[in-house]
């Protein structure tokens, strides 16, 4: 039982979520709320990053589960020390962190929705991207030659320092992006700015790229287009990073190289055998057979070798197809009372039980728990002198 669930709620996962589920949740939310796409969601992006930083670290997650956010704060001498949200994003998507960003232009990260069929068969998709490119008219200068000057407000630092009093004898130093030069450290007189880029040095350009999704690739796998990201003056262009996002499939679930599916069979089929067909992800039809005399129990697993997912970079090799059988039992009174002895004669004999006078005979009814956990209501009943509240119910008919 965790103390609080705020970080889990931010990522939209349960406290029992696996590390892979936490990574997948962060990936989707970080791409959705990244400042480049949602400039007004900076605080949301920050909270998502903080939640992921804690829950992706087994030690921090354990501390959080036991003591909540307060325990995280106490573990950091009174205030939690979180990494930069952009550093977390870049490390997750392969950007390399702040130092790499200072030497290179921004990476452009895009999520590409794919089906399980796409990952099984391979597919090529075209993706239209918007990216920054150096302005050809001013060659990345931003204006006329010689018109660029050091920003007088921040003295070329790109940042402003503000001193704020937060209490008697206590002040706080706050660093913000310079409002005059927008963090560039330099400015251009409006009349001298380039007409094409308005002094921004770069312009937005649409580009179509072809993304080759190879057989066996996985959900969350990254495809890198080196040097195709945003361009900035005097910096090496960033990369375009495509992140595959697999849609849920109606029949199959993927587990590594294997495929898992559930198949319903009638009780007669479970006892007497059957032939069934399965449509594969490349539209072939498989015929599976359970021979007469073989008994399949509810929940039993069977497998078909070499019918799982192709293995990435070795597509001629495949995992296995795992089938879980769900046996459907007949409805009540499906057979007349007169015919039940005939059925019983065909089935294994019932276990005989010796009943004595000191035994209590009780009535067996269907268990129908309501939406709330029946154990909690039982505990409440034990503590409540007035008797049970609304809890476990049994059908009366």
Curated annotation (Swiss-Prot):
Gene3D superfamilies: DnaJ domain, Heat shock protein DnaJ, cysteine-rich domain, Urease metallochaperone UreE, N-terminal domain
Residues with Phosphoserine modification: 18
Entries under SMART domains matching the protein: DnaJ
Membrane topology category: Lipid-anchor
Record-listed Zn(2+) 1 binding positions: 135, 138, 194, 197
Location, primary (coarse class): membrane
Source organism of this protein record: Homo sapiens
Modified positions (Cysteine methyl ester) in chain numbering: 394
Name of this protein: DnaJ homolog subfamily A member 4
